[in-house]
């Protein structure tokens, strides 16, 4: 018989840095999940990613307190800031520009985000990422 799903927990955890402190510990603890088991499994799967990159994760908790989790790609804003070499986006994106990204960089980010985007084709994915860049105060070249 299939296990019954008890809860879905959505978190954003730094790659390779999951530990029992908040936000991971309380979110998993209230559902009775073995927190250290999740931390070890998550850190093992995120070893190849940039250390500290925020990774969205969806944890499925079953009624027997077992769990599975699926990781998504880092947020577009994080990837754009990394590509532009900036710490944070603009507070006034329409007037203050804080950096530039090229079409090639947008294509690279769109390719990385492809599994999580709902775009019909690659061009639509690039336009989606370009819109995110503009809303952060980045100039889009090309």
Curated annotation (Swiss-Prot):
UniProt keyword list: Methylation, Ribonucleoprotein, Ribosomal protein, RNA-binding, rRNA-binding
GO MF annotation list: large ribosomal subunit rRNA binding; structural constituent of ribosome
One record GO biological process: translation
Gene Ontology terms: cellular component: cytosolic large ribosomal subunit
Iron among keywords: no
SMART domains: RL11 (SM00649)
Record note on quaternary structure: Part of the ribosomal stalk of the 50S ribosomal subunit. Interacts with L10 and the large rRNA to form the base of the stalk. L10 forms an elongated spine to which L12 dimers bind in a sequential fashion forming a multimeric L10(L12)X complex.
Family: Belongs to the universal ribosomal protein uL11 family.
Protein name per UniProt: Large ribosomal subunit protein uL11
Organism: Alcanivorax borkumensis (strain ATCC 700651 / DSM 11573 / NCIMB 13689 / SK2)
Taxonomic lineage from the root: Bacteria, Pseudomonadati, Pseudomonadota, Gammaproteobacteria, Oceanospirillales
Gene: rplK
């Amino acid at each position: 018989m299939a296990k019954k799903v008890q809860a879905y927990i959505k978190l954003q955890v730094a790659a390779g840095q999951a530990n029992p402190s908040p936000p991971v510990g309380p979110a998993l603890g209230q559902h009775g999940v073995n927190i250290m088991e999740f931390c070890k499994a998550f850190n093992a799967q995120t070893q190849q990613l940039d250390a500290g990159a925020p990774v969205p994760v969806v944890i499925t908790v079953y009624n027997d307190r077992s769990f599975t989790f699926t990781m998504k790609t880092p947020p577009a804003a994080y990837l754009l800031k990394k590509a532009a070499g900036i710490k944070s986006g603009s507070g006034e994106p329409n007037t203050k520009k804080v950096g530039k990204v090229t079409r090639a960089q947008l294509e690279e980010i769109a390719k990385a985000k492809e599994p999580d985007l709902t775009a019909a084709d690659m061009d639509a994915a690039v336009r989606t990422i370009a819109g995110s860049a503009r809303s952060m105060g980045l100039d889009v070249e090309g």
